[in-house]
């Protein structure tokens, strides 16, 4: 047959009267009898495929293409199996005019049937239903489809497909969810139109707020601002599309300040824009690196974990964010590994850059690109990027640039400007103590991120007394260790 075949799919609620003799329909095998195979054309209509018209061996729930031979007066449908190459036809849904809903509006439609067009961003098989995480132009939610316990529903649906989902809007464990009655993959112009609509909305939502400007007067930061906005937008879009983020950073005080500022912004942004309240635990991971570059050991760990998550939990491959490392020629071997897996990589670093690595990066923030130098530290860059990701975190992280600056012994004028922002709250000596405490504690943490301990050192946990006692203890221990060397 030619390349212009149309295969019809009977939409939910459609009846026998909506079927046309001679047309080809997409169905699912319901069961078997001695005289033939029963084929479901939708949730209400089924037909009989006589054994003389069977061309291939099928199992229950398998998809099958059938042509309608005859619709009998009593409503029984006689079918004949046809075989077509996947690229030789387009599927067209037979349905009444569709009233589309948006995921963001589900909370106002609990108990009602909805139709959603969305991108599949995760597929997770549980011991019960299959959970499809879907993303439209308004948000991300889960759609639960059940065939039988532990059996994959809609096996034809893959990660990255555009789907039309029919089902009931429900609330489960205080989270919105769609109980799926039907789902099918959109192809061709239908899929393209949905992708364009979603992409246009995501581009607008991912754009950092226009009113966010650098905290201080700085020619270097002003010149870098457009690239910083670009990097922040990539991070925001990753969150909005349910793409995991791996943040790798140098395991010193400057790198920690850079990474924790972005971590603070991203975690809150995930909670503000996601469906699953626990998703910040698996969509973001911060990992310190011993070397000031992306080592083969580090990229191997990351690849191993992300590929396992992709297979086990149906997650997208992650965005790799490198901070206080990533700009040098020493990073090249790891970038070649990321290229094999077509990973998205972005960098915010203040080490002298090598232009040969730029071809591997979607965004590259480095003060050397605009006439600056290492005095504008990674912690300064990270704090400004964090504000672009989520401006609401600014009061929590306002002291990070000063801590990072004194940690790296910056002589840039930006350090004094950042210190002036926290005058009356933290002294320069207190910033030095936090920096030393971070370096000392990270030594014992090794490759662990020490999230809550680090937050206490940086006074992020609203426990100032514990912060003061912990920093004082770590500084004492660090100084004793230095004297013993």
PLM region spans:
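Single-stranded RNA-binding regions, centering on S1/OB-family and related RNA-binding modules
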Residues: 1-117, 122, 126-130, 136-149, ...
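A residue-level signal for conserved active-site and pocket-lining positions in enzyme catalytic cores
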Residues: 118, 167, 382
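Conserved beta-strand elements of beta-rich interaction domains across eukaryotes
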Residues: 139, 170, 369-370
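Gly/His-enriched, cation/cofactor- and phosphate-binding structural elements
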Residues: 143-155, 159, 171-179, 184-186, ...
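N-terminal accessory interaction module
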Residues: 160-167
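Hard-cation-handling environments
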Residues: 241, 410-485
């Amino acid at each position: 047959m030619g390349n212009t075949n149309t295969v019809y799919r009977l939409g939910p609620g459609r009846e026998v009267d909506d079927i046309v003799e001679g047309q080809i329909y997409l169905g699912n095998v319901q069961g078997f009898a001695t005289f033939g195979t029963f084929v479901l054309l939708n949730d209400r209509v089924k037909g009989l495929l006589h054994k003389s018209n069977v061309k291939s061996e099928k199992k229950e729930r398998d998809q099958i293409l059938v042509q309608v031979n005859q619709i009998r007066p009593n409503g029984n449908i006689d079918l004949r199996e046809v075989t077509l190459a996947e690229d030789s036809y387009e599927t067209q849904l037979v349905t009444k005019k569709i009233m589309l809903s948006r995921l963001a509006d589900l909370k106002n439609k609990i108990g009602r049937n909805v139709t959603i067009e969305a991108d599949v961003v995760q597929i997770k098989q549980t011991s019960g239903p299959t959970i499809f995480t879907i993303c439209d132009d308004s948000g991300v939610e889960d759609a639960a489809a059940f065939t039988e316990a532990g059996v994959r529903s809609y096996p034809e649906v893959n990660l990255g497909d555009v789907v039309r989902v029919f089902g009931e809007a429900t609330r489960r464990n205080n989270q919105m969810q769609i109980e799926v009655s039907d789902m099918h993959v959109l192809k061709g112009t239908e899929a393209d139109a949905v992708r364009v609509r979603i992409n246009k909305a995501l581009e607008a939502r991912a754009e950092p707020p226009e009113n966010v400007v650098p905290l201080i007067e700085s020619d270097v930061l002003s010149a870098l601002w457009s690239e910083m906005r670009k990097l922040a937008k990539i991070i925001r879009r990753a969150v909005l599309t349910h793409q995991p983020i791996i943040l790798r950073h140098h395991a010193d005080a400057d790198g920690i300040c850079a990474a924790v500022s972005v971590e603070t912004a991203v975690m809150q942004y995930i909670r503000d824009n996601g469906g699953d309240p626990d998703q910040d635990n698996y969509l973001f991971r911060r990992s310190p690196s011993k070397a000031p570059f992306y080592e083969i050991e580090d990229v191997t760990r990351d690849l191993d974990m992300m590929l396992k998550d992709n297979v086990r939990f149906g997650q997208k491959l992650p965005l790799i964010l490198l901070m206080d490392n990533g700009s040098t020629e020493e990073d090249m071997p790891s970038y070649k590994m990321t290229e094999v897996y077509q990973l998205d990589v972005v960098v915010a670093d203040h080490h002298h850059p090598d232009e040969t690595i730029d071809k591997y990066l979607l965004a590259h923030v480095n003060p050397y690109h605009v006439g600056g130098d290492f005095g504008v530290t990674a912690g300064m860059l990270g704090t400004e990027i964090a504000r672009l990701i989520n401006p609401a975190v600014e009061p929590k992280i306002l002291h990070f640039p000063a801590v990072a600056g004194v940690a790296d012994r910056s002589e840039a004028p930006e350090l004094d400007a950042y210190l002036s922002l926290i005058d009356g709250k933290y002294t320069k000596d207190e910033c030095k103590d936090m920096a030393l405490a971070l370096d000392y504690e990270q030594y014992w943490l090794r490759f662990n991120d020490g999230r809550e301990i680090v937050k206490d050192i940086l006074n992020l946990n609203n426990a100032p007394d514990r912060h003061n006692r912990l920093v004082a203890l770590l500084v004492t221990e660090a100084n004793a260790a230095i004297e013993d060397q």
